[in-house]
A protein has these predicted regions:
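Extracytoplasmic beta-strand/coil segments of soluble accessory domains associated
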Residues: 37, 65, 69-110, 114
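Face-selective signature of the C-terminal outer-membrane beta-barrel domain
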Residues: 229-236, 275-433, 460-462, 520-526
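Gram-negative outer-membrane beta-barrel transporters
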Residues: 409, 417, 521, 526-531, ...
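Short acidic/polar hinge/loop motifs at secondary-structure boundaries
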Residues: 110-138, 157, 500, 539
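Transmembrane beta-barrel wall of Gram-negative outer-membrane proteins
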Residues: 174-203, 208-247, 271-290, 294, ...
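Short strand-turn segments of transmembrane beta-barrel domains in outer membranes
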Residues: 142, 153, 157-188, 199, ...
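C-terminal beta-signal and adjacent terminal beta-strands/loops
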Residues: 477, 569, 619-628, 648-712
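Membrane-embedded beta-barrel scaffold of Gram-negative outer-membrane proteins
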Residues: 284, 288, 294-300, 304-312, ...
Length: 712
């Protein structure tokens, strides 16, 4: 069960009740999308940053979303205060509740975005398996990687057996709220062959009642590498159980749910849960066909199973009192999703009219089959069965030319055929609400094929080794996923959704500068992004719609300064103005996007290698609540947190102690406002929103985490 679909169901309920990359002045072109990492130094003209394995190891943050939040342009929404990032959402350039559908996630350069609202599960990647993370901001990534890269692309590059740092390693963690984790990795190399395996196991009681987590992850890769031929085979699997505490009202409601934000650790849904099991196989090879010409072929199959159960906690007869012992299953979700792909491409380096030139061109094909049963309880005949197939076939090319030793230009394009076939099988006999629908609740069949296109134009000019400017323009698109086409449903939601969501499109332009003075580095850029048919969920009616035109205007600046050999500081600031351009909400803010956010950090090698101190502070400004397109409700308050980590190494042993949220801030960064009730059989005229009423997901205060381990 995805975080997005969970938020949809909770939203429907509340609607009823209430590293900076330096430039080099040289003719050689930056590598783009070749071999193991398809991003490397990024596309010309884009704002790109890299997080290394050393950055991850030294950071007090112990999950990917919090590590990523220490980069400009990125904000995070937490639902469960989970130490490993389970159910967290990473938002790149201001997309709020559906951020996960507007950021394209890659692992080793391959798409891993699932065809549902869970998107990418950050908790499924062991941190000890990561070699680096590459972030490319803006629309340009769609040209190379396909639909969904509206806010940008995040590429997680995993260690290989021959990677630096990929040694045999074991480590253990213990922390607040019964958090325990074990990690292990092993690597070996023999001639052209190498193998690496990484895994971890997590158990946590969680900050809130019914927020327990059990997670298991493993990935392994076999590689073969010679100068003219390389190949790999990888397998990854993960298994998760997650309790699902809903949001808490901001006031006590006699006769309603018993707990409010006055007791933030409590849960009004102590029985709800979600499970996930997934396995992924990938294989591929790269071969040098002739000098400067390389063929790269990848293929993969991913299969994911998800189950979730939601309960009705109110008695079915007067006085309709809240009960846990008498709670009955209200909604059960059993989903199977299979995605297969093949992506052949050519990387050609040559001279074009005497100028160094690199051309990357290829085809990618993805086929996803989504089947979801929705009975009221396990073992019963489904009320709805959703069967959706999506196929995409893309053709793309990206050409990069060194016009001069100090100037590069890139131009690329993609055309992509998108086909969707969707069916809903409805059983009125098994639907307790069957008699209340004004029309047939079965979603009409939907079959569609369309062509979409993406483009990128980028330019970079280096005035010297110390100063460069860059700019780009791009077009991108994203398709509605299965959960967005299905909607939320649930009791008292009598609007029948449609599978027919329009494709979201976007144009953006960006310009910036880079400064590299050795000890001091800085990157700053401004951008404008204009979108049409942005896909969004409305809890008041329980379905997804295409919004009126929207836009983002932003400024991002990141800096790094090496004070001396032992001490370095970093910081960044982000401004995003995300608004509606047209329609009844023209000029209003997009919910769940803070205009201002930032981070600052200090790393001090107190005793080099033996003792290191890292201090990180993160700040996000106030933001509109989910479901508050009208901008009438209170704001989610601004907040800042400080994390501290002290760690060291001796011989082959290492240790660390982290204190997170040092000043014990009690806050939330996700809340959903009352949106009223749409017209229906129980409320023919509908009900307006209740101003000041909202549900929030409170987060933990001060926590600690201890680590010890060894390499061998």
């Amino acid at each position: 069960m995805g975080r997005g679909h969970t938020a949809k169901l909770l939203g429907a309920a509340v609607a009823l009740t209430a590293s900076i990359s330096g430039s080099q002045a040289q003719v050689a072109l930056p590598p783009i999308d070749v071999s193991w990492t398809r991003l490397n130094s990024g596309m010309v003209g884009t704002s790109t940053s890299i997080i290394t394995s050393q950055d991850i190891e030294s950071s007090p943050a112990q999950n990917l979303p919090d590590i990523l939040s220490q980069q400009v342009g990125i904000q995070v929404q937490h639902l469960l205060s989970s130490t490993n990032g389970s159910r967290d959402t990473v938002d790149l350039r201001g997309f709020g509740v559906f951020a996960q559908s507007n950021v394209l996630m890659l692992v080793n350069g391959r798409r891993v975005q699932d065809f549902d609202l869970q998107g990418f599960d950050f908790s499924s990647i062991p941190l000890n398996s990561i070699e680096r993370i590459e972030i490319t901001r803006g629309n340009s990534g769609t040209t190379l990687y396909g639909d969904g890269a509206i806010g940008g692309v995040i590429n997680i590059v995993l260690k290989k057996g021959s990677s630096p740092g990929a040694t045999n390693r074991v480590e253990a963690f213990g922390g607040s709220y019964q958090y325990w984790e074990g990690r292990a990795s092993a690597a070996a190399t023999s001639g052209p062959w190498s193998v690496g395996a990484f895994g971890n196991a997590i158990s946590s009681g969680g900050y809130r009642v019914n927020s327990a987590l059990r997670q298991r992850n493993i990935n392994a890769t076999l590689n073969y590498a010679t100068p003219n031929l390389g190949a790999y085979f990888s397998v990854a699997g993960d298994r998760q159980f997650q309790g699902l505490p809903a949001g808490l009202n901001n006031f006590n409601n006699p006769g309603g749910f018993p707990f409010s934000l006055e007791t933030p650790w409590q849960s009004n849904t102590p029985l709800d849960w979600g499970k996930k099991q997934a396995i992924n196989f990938a294989t591929g090879f790269n071969a040098t066909l002739s000098p400067g010409v390389e063929l790269i072929v990848d293929g993969s199959v991913r299969r994911k199973f998800q189950q979730a159960q939601f309960y009705n906690y109110f008695e079915s007869a007067p006085p309709f009192a809240y009960t846990v012992g008498g709670a009955t299953s209200m909604n059960y979700v059993d989903t199977v999703m299979t995605t297969s792909s093949v992506t052949p491409r050519l990387d050609v380096s040559h001279q074009l009219f005497g100028l160094p030139n690199r051309l990357l061109t290829g085809i990618d094909f993805y086929n996803t089959q989504y089947n979801s049963d929705r009975p009221t309880a396990p073992g019963l005949v489904p009320v709805h069965n959703y069967d959706i197939q999506q196929r995409t076939l893309g053709f793309y090319a990206m050409n990069t030319t060194a016009l001069r030793p100090d100037t590069d230009i890139s131009i690329g394009g993609r055309i992509q055929k998108n086909s969707v076939n969707a069916r809903d099988s409805y059983s009125a006999f098994n639907d307790p609400n069957a008699g209340f629908y004004p029309n047939n609740p079965e979603i009409p069949p939907f079959d569609q094929s369309e062509w979409q296109w993406a483009a990128h134009l980028g330019l970079e000019h280096r005035f010297s080794n110390a100063f460069a400017v860059f700019g780009r323009a791009a077009r991108a698109f994203r398709l509605g996923n299965a959960d967005e086409r299905v909607g939320a449903g649930g009791p008292f939601i009598f609007i029948v959704p449609t599978f027919d969501l329009k494709t979201q499109t976007s144009w953006d332009v960006e310009g910036g500068l880079r400064v590299n003075l050795g000890q001091f580095r800085l990157e700053s850029s401004v951008y404008l992004m204009r979108l049409n048919n942005e896909i969004h969920f409305l809890p008041a009616i329980g379905v997804d719609i295409n919004l009126d035109p929207t836009q983002r205007v932003g400024w991002e600046t990141a800096a790094f300064y090496q004070i001396n050999n032992a001490m370095r500081v970093r910081g960044g600031v982000t401004y995003i103005n995300a608004t509606f351009r047209e329609g009844p909400f023209a000029g209003n803010d997009i919910p769940l996007v803070s205009q201002w956010s930032g981070y600052a950090g200090l790393t001090w090698d107190v005793v080099p290698k033996w003792l290191t101190l890292d201090v990180t502070s993160r700040l996000f400004g106030s933001r509109r609540m989910d479901n508050d397109q009208a901008n009438l409700q209170p704001l989610i308050p601004a907040q800042a947190t400080v994390d501290v980590k002290l760690g060291g190494k001796y011989d082959r042993f290492f240790w660390s102690a982290a204190l997170l949220n040092v000043f014990d801030a009690h806050y939330y960064d996700y809340a959903i406002a009352s949106g009223g009730i749409a017209a229906g059989p129980f409320f023919p005229a509908g009900l307006p929103p209740t101003i000041g009423l909202f549900n929030a997901f409170p987060l933990a205060g001060r926590t600690f985490l201890l680590q010890a381990g060894a390499t061998f």
